[in-house]
Amino acid sequence: MDDLTAQALKDFTARYCDAWHEEHKSWPLSEELYGVPSPCIISTTEDAIYWQPQPFTGEQNVNAVERAFDIVIQPTIHTFYTTQFAGDMHAQFGDIKLTLLQTWSEDDFRRVQENLIGHLVTQKRLKLPPTLFIATLEEELEVISVCNLSGEVCKETLGTRKRTHLASNLAEFLNQLKPLL
């Protein structure tokens, strides 16, 4: 496990939860995750859940993605998706508003790996360098990804070579995120 990335993710999650507490006097609330089982759920309302991050309990790797492509995935990606269970968190990096993706449960972790595999299949078919997404943007065809060759974080337009460098590594990126509520 990449300790710098794990700590940066935990630190951002704490900043996010602290901001939520400050603004709403509660743990983060999600309507989107209502009815979806997770160890993160601490209480349920009529149409939403309150959540708090929990330690990841499964195998701490995305080996299914590695096996599917017979490639080695950046250690930071293993760490990013296996440090904790949490809800997705809205954030800002510079002037970019994003949703930082998280694994919600062990079932969700399997789905995330399947989506990463699908993303890599498309990139391979289009002969694009491999990236692994970590966040979504309002623009549907743009994501924040980690380049699997260099470990750099970039804003990527899906299906194209258009990439904008954002940070030299995932820990640096996470450390610069500001929570958005």
UniProtKB/Swiss-Prot annotation:
Family matches, as InterPro entries: Syd, Syd_sf
Keyword Chloroplast set for record: no
Pfam families linked to this entry: Syd
Cell compartment(s), UniProt: Cell inner membrane
Name assigned to this protein: Protein Syd
Cellular component, GO annotation: cytoplasmic side of plasma membrane
Function per UniProt: Interacts with the SecY protein in vivo. May bind preferentially to an uncomplexed state of SecY, thus functioning either as a chelating agent for excess SecY in the cell or as a regulatory factor that negatively controls the translocase function.
Protein's membrane topology: Peripheral membrane protein
Superkingdom to which the source organism belongs: Bacteria
Lineage of the species this protein comes from: Bacteria, Pseudomonadati, Pseudomonadota, Gammaproteobacteria, Enterobacterales
Subcellular location, principal: membrane
Family: Belongs to the Syd family.
Keywords recorded for this protein, A-Z: Cell inner membrane, Cell membrane, Membrane
Gene3D superfamilies reported for this sequence: Syd protein
Record bears the keyword Kinase: no
